[in-house]
Amino acid sequence: MEHSIFPRSLWTNDSKILHHHVADFFSSVQVTQDIPAGTSFGPCVLHNTFYDTIAFIALKSFDKRNKSYVFRVDPEAMKGSPLVVPWLRLVQAAMSEEDQNTEAYLKGGQLHFRTIRDVKEGEELLVWYDEELSHLLGFRDIKAKALTDGYTCTRCGQAFKNENPFLAHCRFLCTQEKVDIIRPINQQKPEVKRHRKVIDFHNIARDLEDKMNTSSFEDTTILRKRKQEPFLTPKSKKTVLLEKTNITNESNTTNANKDCRAFRDLSEPTDNAQTNESKISKNSAFTEVRKAPEPSNPEKSSRDIMAPEVGLQSNCSAFSFVVPKSARSEQKSAFCEPSKRALAEAQNPSPPDTDNSLDSFKSKSSLGYRNVLASHLFPTDLAGSHSGGGMSAPLTSGGSYYYAPEHWTRAIGGQLQSTSSLTLLPPTFTPLGVSVQNWCAKCNLSFRMTSDLVFHMRSHHKKEFAAEAQVRRRREEKLTCPICHEYFRERHHLSRHMTSHN
């Protein structure tokens, strides 16, 4: 018989998979000899497209059974036969525990049958799931609910005489609206719909300006209260990467103000003039950070000049750019290629002044995401790594680095600088505007676009990697044992190993 005589709604839905041949519902299997308890049969390999789930036993469970086909099987003779798979699928499901004489269980990832009591000659095999499979299919929870309400479906109101058809109906065959069977109706939790986050890029700047202008007085009072609280130690601070997601215009501005107030814990108290100046510079989300006046002391070290920018000051906007004081002529961004003059100034700083090196970190009044990733939170000093130890690193603990050079670069051919800050930082950190994400570790070059870096790697370094891999593969083939395929570093080790096979 064909599969098309069933309604389409019964076998196309994933929860109502009644995908079986009609003959299987009206067949029964009887044994021709006595079978003791504990006898196993199988495996029942579900390789057919109509039998791709272990739920086929439950789908054949009904209160009324019509026997149109009777198969008499000798299980002992069928154990080693390839027909063991078809006749196991013909075994009908038991209606209750009293009728059950065989249970289905998993062994080695396959379905097996096992007798739970002595089966006499001519008796029909009736199977149901063991405790493990009943728990996996969710029958335990439905059974606990059925002890109080009886065998009546809470969805469609259909009543059953036996337990197993009721469980199969509630779990797979009920076509009504699905309700939580385990929990009563009056205790069911209402459905909570999640609101999708909508990022409004058009009104970020306008809403941020309006909100921060109205909440300037509130920020001032909160800042005064938090000045009296003890500051966190560097050990208790966590360096985390924060991502801005704007849900709506109102929630965007609210979250922005909360972020700004939260980052004030990391800043040190400054005078009122610096606070007012930083608030004015943060009114717009797309304004540049103003250049600070030249220091009065001409002999001040370049580390004191770069310290506020190494601390990564910015406003609360994700679109603002930082203008490093070491490169005054042009603006720097994480996606722009730095000029040679700015990079030369960053890599060749003047000797620092150790007396004033700690005072350079006091200018931290401006707030932003980059303030969390400031150099005072890392155990490695950023500016001190450019000169290979020539500059002092007062915040370095024990002289150890978290980001070792060999974890970020792979020296093939020429030797790279191991003390460069580009090899000591993760790809998400961009000191002095140098684009680490679009940086070639082999040539020490930075690219403005990621596509340029990809084109550079394919055109300049593809042959080198291919040649190296080919040489390594040939060497491994020569130093590999042809019998046990064990690899050796030296050829005389392989020669000594080959004597063991003789």
UniProtKB/Swiss-Prot annotation:
The UniProt annotation places S-adenosyl-L-methionine binding at Y129
Alphabetically ordered keywords of this record: DNA-binding, Metal-binding, Methyltransferase, Neurogenesis, Nucleus, Repeat, Repressor, Transcription, Transcription regulation, Transferase, Zinc, Zinc-finger
Enzyme Commission number(s) of this protein: 2.1.1.-
Q: Where in the cell is it found?
A: Nucleus
| Span of zinc fingers (C2H2-type) | 151-174, 438-460, 479-501
Q: In which tissues is it expressed?
A: Expressed in pMN progenitors and oligodendrocyte lineage cells in the embryo with expression declining in oligodendrocytes undergoing differentiation.
What Pfam families would the database entry show? PRDM2_PR
Regions of biased composition (Polar residues) lie at 269-286
SMART domains found in the cross-reference section? ZnF_C2H2
- GO molecular function annotation: DNA binding; methyltransferase activity; zinc ion binding
- The record's top EC class is transferase
GO CC term (a single one):
nucleus
Q: By its UniProt entry, which InterPro entries does this protein fall under?
A: PRDM8-like_PR/SET, SET_dom, SET_dom_sf, TR-Histone_Methyltrans, Znf_C2H2_sf, Znf_C2H2_type
Query: Can you cite a GO biological process for this protein?
Result: regulation of DNA-templated transcription
Tell me the domain of life. Answer: Eukaryota
Instruction: Return the annotated region ranges for Disordered.
Output: 267-303, 338-361
Which residue ranges does the record assign to the SET domain?
A: 8-130
Q: Which PANTHER family match?
A: AGAP007109-PA (PTHR16516), ZINC FINGER PROTEIN 488 (PTHR16516:SF5)
Q: Which family does it belong to?
A: Belongs to the krueppel C2H2-type zinc-finger protein family.
Q: What does this protein do?
A: Transcriptional repressor. May have histone methyltransferase activity. Negatively regulates shh signaling activity in pMN progenitor cells which prevents their switch from motor neuron to oligodendrocyte precursor cell production. Independently of shh activity, also regulates oligodendrocyte formation.
Q: What is this protein called?
A: Zinc finger protein 488
